[in-house]
From Swiss-Prot:
One of its GO terms (cellular component) is membrane. The active site is at H265. One of its GO terms (biological process) is lipid A biosynthetic process. Pathway: Glycolipid biosynthesis; lipid IV(A) biosynthesis; lipid IV(A) from (3R)-3-hydroxytetradecanoyl-[acyl-carrier-protein] and UDP-N-acetyl-alpha-D-glucosamine: step 2/6. It catalyses: a UDP-3-O-[(3R)-3-hydroxyacyl]-N-acetyl-alpha-D-glucosamine + H2O = a UDP-3-O-[(3R)-3-hydroxyacyl]-alpha-D-glucosamine + acetate. It comes from Salmonella paratyphi A (strain AKU_12601). Catalyzes the hydrolysis of UDP-3-O-myristoyl-N-acetylglucosamine to form UDP-3-O-myristoylglucosamine and acetate, the committed step in lipid A biosynthesis. This is UDP-3-O-acyl-N-acetylglucosamine deacetylase. It comes from the Bacteria. Zn(2+) binds at H79, H238, D242.
Amino acid sequence: MIKQRTLKRIVQATGVGLHTGKKVTLTLRPAPANTGVIYRRTDLNPPVDFPADAKSVRDTMLCTCLVNEHDVRISTVEHLNAALAGLGIDNIVIEVNAPEIPIMDGSAAPFVYLLLDAGIDELNCAKKFVRIKETVRVEDGDKWAEFRPYNGFTLDFTIDFSHPAIDSSSQRYAMNFSADAFMRQISRARTFGFMRDIEYLQSRGLCLGGSFDCAIVVDDYRVLNEDGLRFEDEFVRHKMLDAIGDLFMCGHNIIGAFTAYKSGHALNNKLLQAVLAKQEAWEFVTFQDDAELPLAFKAPSTVLA
């Protein structure tokens, strides 16, 4: 039986909140089978839980939020959610003493390291996957995203940014998903933004944690970070990272082929909701052994060590 995963032990880290610029303590806790992914704000009394759920997602100018029925929110969940998807973590409680997850370096890599440091444990309960049975597509003007049936998980993402720092050959990225591929090719890609936008937001008391330490910053002509880019095509790789996190908001790894053109958090979420709303378009599946499991989801030794 392919089993659900959680952490072996509690781990903690600190970072800066993108919105407030204040120190945030992040605690990751193991959770029993069928708990799912739970985000928890401990700065509120009593603490408030936000289960990962496609219908709770709100896209803001700066990040992805989860919002409950009382309009209480937790922000900047997307990069940690991508790390959970990358390592196939089914059950976890994520605590922060703030209204947001720390931005760290603007990628998912610090969260991957934290999860691997905690160790990954298998629970004696079958892991559920969402398998795509029918093609589902959503559009917004010239932007679109779709899922097609496929026995694995592939992603093909195209951006269309007209900027001297972004070469035309660096606007598309495609990959066969696996934990190894995610960690090596995607997890280190950072979020990006224009210096003028960051300065404008900070003048209004927003994005106070935004800096060269947590994003690729560009002006009209070039990348301003002293160290430059981590990959020639880091921009599109980060958009794929975002998509992996957005699509894991259902709390399950997805078996299917994802293709997108100029998509963002809102359209990725719209696609996920469109799939889940169409009963005949998907099904839950479990697997008895590795022989049945799509190659995309076979755990490398680095994960289940």
